[in-house]
A protein has these predicted regions:
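Catalytic glycan-binding domains that act on GlcNAc-containing polysaccharides
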Residues: 1-108, 121-124, 132-150, 155-160, ...
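Surface-exposed charge patches
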Residues: 22, 53, 90, 177-180, ...
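Short glycine/proline-rich, acidic loop/turn segments that cap or connect secondary-structure elements
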Residues: 109-124, 172-182
Length: 228
């Protein structure tokens, strides 16, 4: 690549699959045999091969799905959700978790439940490969988008449940206020940006536990009101 071709984003990511320079040094591949690992040119072969190498190095498991959309039984304890709480497949089966089509949950290894759009949206059982994608980009939305696109390219179906426009039934300002009030109380909820991620949910769990509330880890208007 010429200096003029080596363009990147404001953060320094470059090439077809947006590699940081240090990532390029570790994982770039000359897959087409030209003698150069060119992730910038019109032919994306090297960029895709380099990305595959990165995912492999991060622990990608061939043949394992990134996630499976599932259905939870009524009165399911939402405190069991969150990607930091993986369980064995047989344990989820005992708790009544099924696939979204009401089928038996297959054993793809330990999995964790996530509710990216709140209790009214889709529920996913995520596996090791989901976490590998997040090492490439930490946003759940990114990992879900990439994972679902790969499913569709492989001929698999759409996500069955819809994504509500207003997850958790709270406005952005209300979610920001929730994060800020948790921070003010000493429960580290992270930057009050209105995006409730794993750090925010961990803070909610800790706060709920301290108050003797049912531990869900989920944001709500009632939780915000309890913080004053």
């Amino acid at each position: 690549a010429t200096p003029a071709e080596m363009r990147g984003s404001f953060a320094g990511a470059m090439g077809h699959t947006q590699f940081m320079p240090s990532t390029y040094q570790r994982h770039a591949q000359d897959f087409d045999g030209t003698g150069h690992a060119n992730i910038w040119g019109d032919d994306p072969t090297d960029a895709l091969a380099s990305t595959a190498q990165l995912l492999k190095a991060e622990g990608w498991r061939k043949g394992q799905p990134w996630a499976v959309e599932v259905t939870l039984p009524r009165e399911f304890d939402l405190a069991l959700t969150g990607r930091i709480f993986p369980r064995k497949t047989r344990d989820w089966q005992r708790l009544g978790v099924t696939t979204a089509s009401s089928g038996k949950l297959a054993d793809h290894g330990n999995g964790a439940l996530i509710l990216p759009a709140g209790p009214e949206g889709p529920v996913f059982m995520v596996y090791n490969n989901f976490h590998v994608i997040k090492k490439y980009n930490y946003a759940d939305s990114y990992a879900i988008g990439v994972g679902h696109l790969s499913d569709r390219l492989a001929g698999r179906g759409k996500i069955r449940s819809g994504f509500p426009q207003n997850p958790w039934g709270m406005s952005t300002r209300e979610r920001q206020a929730l994060q800020q009030r948790l921070n003010d109380r000493g429960f580290a909820a992270g930057n009050p940006d209105g995006v409730i991620g794993e750090k925010g949910r961990a803070a909610i769990r800790a706060y709920e536990q301290s108050r003797g509330f049912p531990v869900t880890g989920l944001p709500s208007k009632a939780l915000l009101a309890s913080l004053g």
